[in-house]
Amino acid sequence: MRALAVAALAAALHLPAGYHASVYASGLDHPTAMSFGPDGRLYVSEDVGKIVSVTRGTYAPGVFRTGLTVPLGLLWRGRTLYVSESGKVEALRRGGSRRLVVGGLPFKEHQQDAIVAGPDGRLYLGSGSTCDACKETNARSATILSFRPDGSGLQIVARGLRNPYGLLFVGKTLYATVNGRDDLGDGEPAEEVVRVRKGDNFGWPLCWASYALRKLAGTCGGVTPPIAYLEPHSSADGIAYWQGDLFVTEWGEYLSTKHGRVLVRIHAGKVSTFASGFVHPLALTTDPAGDLLVADWGSGVIYAVSKSP
């Protein structure tokens, strides 16, 4: 009976013709990030402070580590698992060791988000703002940071990003999703996907991406514009590259179904809804079989999306 109920969840998703979804794993408690480990298992962080591991068809995830502080980013690098948490990044090993890599980072309204490995051997981390729209007192807020795997050489790569939740390298190019401010009304500003280069300023809090105008608004001298404008207040979060396009989850709003709760595709700069029917889609990754994996924070299910045979 449980297998039938889980299969019904996948059947409730709405996908374009030629694609289908299946349940990769279920029974998760608010999944936030995913990374495949050296053992081939998929490791998943849960915002309740746990990391679990799953394989395709898992209904009862295995606990890998507990006692974490709101883990939102995961990255396996060799035999070390890097975890971004509130104010810090830790390195975990299978034998039980736990090491602080970077600490003392600012957090309040937002915190540290995705962590990814760059082609230069450094690690890259999204660091959200401490407020909705204010002048930060800590230069590491509202930035993308980079550092060596041992935590040394911390640098600010880009600034002016209110909450750069998702990070993704496609070759040598770094992309980020950005959550826009909340104080400009229901129709502004756009959520953003940006292409990041060292030294970029993306404008927050004085400049924002206008969804109505599809251009920057406010005080925007020297600001780098986004490559895609997404629905306001939809919470653009997870990002993946699949079948030649960028895909982004829109988590939505906690108490409203008005915005988001969909998976969007960005093709040639145009944004369109690719899949709907989720509760709160959040994390994205691809698996070795070539599927796109979507972790639904709201339902505790990871879906595998693939092209129909």
Q: What function would you assign to each model-found segment?
A:
Residues 14-15, 112, 129-134, 139-152, ...:
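Beta-propeller domain segments
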Residues 25, 32-35, 75, 116, ...:
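Conserved beta-strand position repeated across blades of beta-propeller domains
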Residues 51-78:
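Blade-loop segments of beta-propeller domains
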Residues 41-44, 80-83, 123-125, 174-176, ...:
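Hydrophobic beta-strand segments that make up the repeating blades of beta-propeller
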Residues 87-118, 126-129:
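Asp-box/WD-like beta-propeller blade repeats and closely related beta-sheet repeat scaffolds
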